[in-house]
Amino acid sequence: MQSPEKRIAIGKNRDGRLEAFYIKPDGVLRHNWQNRPNSIWKGEVSLGVSARQVAGGANADGRLEIFYLTPDGEVCHDWQLEPGGDWNGKESLGADGRALDVSSNADGRLELFWVGRDGALWHDRQLEPSGDRNG
C-alpha cells in the first residue's frame, strides 16, 4: 500500500530555476535547486527540520513558501526572505494535522488546507498577496 503522505514538492523561483523539496527516509526535509534555469542542480541541502509531508507554493512577489507536517503532526511553514534567497526558518502555525496542501487564490494569496486530527478540513490564507497569514 502506498503512503498517502506527500514527500516531495516542486517550486519555480522567480528567475525560472526549479527547486525541489523532499523528505528522505530519515525524515529530514531537504531541498535542491538548479544553478540556472534548465541547468545542473546545486546539491542537496537540509532545511534543518524533520517532516512527514510537504507542500509548496510561490508567493505573488516570487518568494517560495513551503508548508509541512512535523513527525508529530504540527503544521509549520518556511519561506524565502527574498525571491531565490535564504530561508526564514521553521514557524509553527499553531495547528495539528494529518494531511495538507496549498494553492494560490486568483488574487495571488496562498491558501493552506489541512485535515486536522479531528478529521475536519481547516484552512488559513494570507491577508494580502505575499503577506501575513489569517491565523
What positions do the PLM features span?
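A structural motif
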Residues: 1-135
